[in-house]
């Protein structure tokens, strides 16, 4: 593993912690892709493949309308605490 001084670029993921993440349209790919279990699986895989950090989408309210884009989300502080408990070395913002 490289030291922090040797690293030139940190790679991270924007996590799917809100409903309807892939698209603002009415098309639904997978309804439950924003669950904690799904986020934990992504976090563990990201850590295993050497990603440096995870970054949540922070929304308190959705956009309303037919899709209520990002209308339901995992609260970010609790989300971060749970993922920090589940992982060993990846940074969680």
Predicted regions: what they are:
Residues 92-93:
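Conserved strand-turn element in the central/C-terminal portion of the radical SAM core barrel
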Residues 1-89:
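N-terminal beta1-alpha1-beta2 module of alpha/beta enzyme domains
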């Amino acid at each position: 593993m490289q030291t922090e001084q040797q690293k030139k670029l940190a790679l991270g993921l924007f996590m799917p912690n809100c409903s309807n993440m892939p698209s603002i349209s009415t098309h639904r790919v997978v309804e439950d892709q924003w669950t904690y279990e799904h986020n934990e699986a992504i976090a563990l895989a990201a850590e295993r493949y050497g990603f440096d950090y995870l970054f949540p989408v922070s929304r308190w309210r959705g956009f309303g309308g037919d899709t209520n884009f990002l209308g339901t989300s995992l609260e970010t502080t609790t989300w971060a605490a749970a993922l920090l408990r589940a992982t060993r070395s990846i940074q969680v913002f």
